[in-house]
Amino acid sequence: MSVNNTYYLVETYVSQCDYSDGEVIALTPEACDKLANNRIPHRVINDFFSEEEHTKDNSVYFFDQIKWFKQFDVFLKNHIDYCRVNDIDLATAHYDPIKFLIDSYITYSFILTGFFKNAVPSSIKLVTDSLCLRQDYSLYKIFRLQKSFYTQLLPTFCQQYGVTLQYVTDKDSLSDLRTPNKGMLKARFKDFLLRLQLKSLLSFIRYRKYLLFKQRKGRLYSKGILFLHTGIYPIDFIVRRAFFEGARVFTMSEDFIFQEGRYTQSIALDFRKTVSNSFNETIRKECMQAAHKLKQQDGLLAWIDEKCQGNVSTLILPYLDNFINHVCVEDIVKIDKASDFYRKEKIDFIVTRCSSGRDSAFILSAVNTKHRLKKICFQHASTVFEQLSLLMYDVYFFDYYVTTDSLSEKYFKIRTNNEVFRHCKIVQSSHYLSALKSSHLKKSRWLKGAKETIIYAPCDTLRGIYNLNTPLYDPNWYCNYLKELIGYFCERRDKIFIFKCRPLGFGWVERVLVPYIKLKNFANIRIENKPLISYLHRVDRIVLDYPTTGFYESVVAKVPTLSLYKGNYLIWEEARKFFGPMLQPFTDAKEAIGHIDRFLASDKKKYVTELPLAQSDIADLFHRMEVSG
């Protein structure tokens, strides 16, 4: 610690800065990497707090937060007549982004509280380039570039602890960063496709309409089904089956609901069209008044301040204000249109992969007691973690949850034995994993070389965004961990390793570790960025450190697989027993490397198992869901 207790908190490395008159603390993997490359002594912010302490009561927090969402819903109903009359819970409908926002503020507040109490700084110099970014208070843009949480929170904490705060910014980064309005360009491109009828052609190919020579009166004949999240196999497969069973198929894409004909695709509902200006204006005024009164809601805001250990709700208020004044207004108008659409078109089922998308919120909220349709969610993410957030994303808003395998079915049946989730029935359709298994067996194995090929797939990483009920590895800790694993891989010259990353510089792994591997030019490490399933027939073994969907895909393909998981994260006990040696806990890189070493030296058969899949027909599944009430 420096004599005058001056600290440089480095979020973005600035080469012109003189770091010599204080202790340097790296806040991000990128900063840590740059400081190390420039041989500047530093520590990381993780040295000042305990992750285990922060996450120890997460299950209690989960249900406590659900109560907070309910209070928020009551507040909105008290001030917005449409929500009260139609019993619409708009806050809970947008659970995902609101939770990410609040949990991120709570996490960063915990980190800074640990730093201020343990470092006892007298002055802080925040080195960052996020000052040049225009703050956007949209809940659905918190994953994109914005002023960092450190930039937002540090003034509050410095005032609370009586610490002086200065900013150090690269002047070159302060230039006006103007980029094309991607949303506008995308909308214009979509209109262009609609005019050319190219979307009808894409639909004709995607859903294999060319195989449907005449309308069938199958088991789903005349049933109206609205599909969200099309364009991926698990949903497109169901769309095709619905076609061949005679259903009336509708698909949604952003501001449009399309009716899928035998050869063409036509617009059934355009959410952009204004129906009643007076209705829109009434909703806008009520939402504006609600947003104003939110500032006086001591109970809602006090809960946030208590969890953040400081007066942080003032920073979150602009996001909630934006949510009420913009998202709620837009949603209510769309909900009214969607509700009328369900009635006119006699929609029987809505099929999605989750409730966390922007479109899902109003589409699902539009279903009320006036409609006799079923809301169905097909599992989008498999996991062995005790991941409570999945219950909200995949179960809470639905009548049926369709799992991909028998193990997941058993897990969700146990976890939904709770008054909050008991209304949702758990069933299974293994069509995705069964198709993956069949496809994998048909593919010829990659020609084996003299050395075994092992693919290592790190978990997806989100820069600076937290969900306290989803296991997320801390970026700074995880970056150092991955560097140690890469060091081990390069020493194992008897093997060839594929380091799988995301394309297009998705996160800090691509910005920090991919250049690191390329710079070192390791002879036995290759970088690949295609989906994991495209490598299943090309590799001898698979190593993961986050047992979710990729783990299940590898297991069903019968590829010898080892998945590590951080030991302080809870996993389902039955999954631990079922997968046996294929799941191994670790606390640090040394322990993880030990597990990998034993895996590479062991008989492959010890790391292969048969994932139970119950075969079922999609049409039968829908019929059972309809008649069961």
Residue ranges and their predicted role:
Residues 1-629:
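Catalytic-core helical/loop segments in enzymes performing group transfer/polymerization on anionic/lipid-linked
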